[in-house]
Amino acid sequence: GLIDAHAHIESPAAALRALKSGVTTARVLGDTYRQALGTRDLIRAGHVPGPELLVSPGHIRPKPGLAFFMVYPQFGDAIDGELRGAERIAEATRALIAEDADVIKVGASERAGLVSTDPRKPELTEDEMRAAVTEAAKKGLYVAAHAHGREGAANAVRAGVRSIEHGTWVDDETLAEMKRRGTFFVPTLAVMSPRGDPQGNAA
């Protein structure tokens, strides 16, 4: 079967669609209200059909969003500010691990597609991401970094993440370092396909 290295499958219906498309394993990088975790557990228990799901129960970043705070209220003091500092990021990583995470997702750069964010701008620092990598490694897990921007991607690679997700503005120097370290690159090309010319360059 196919492996979808970057997906957002949060329901049995979505899981079934993926399976019918030939996907037998998918990494679900980010969850909303534990829906992906629940779907994963239903599949593993044999209650519903679907691919094997490897789930990150959240997306650790300075402004993780309302859903994160509702699932992890212990970080509520940051709801009007930012989740910052290596120890706080390590704590957030432990919280995701306690939810039976298969992988940890961190934000190395801001999100794309929103008027309020600049995807080229770095988010978590190298030290903060290294704290997540260290905590994940204690449980035999790895970290995937959402990284559009050049600086954020470079920070994430130096921090020791296993994979760079998106990598829109990643430069040759960082790609060379990724090759040296064995860091995987997941370019998520399907994200861009709806924005392209469906006819291609016919000339």
What do these predicted regions represent?
Residues 167, 202-203:
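A general structural motif
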Residues 7-10, 30-34, 148-150, 166-171:
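Short beta->alpha connector loops
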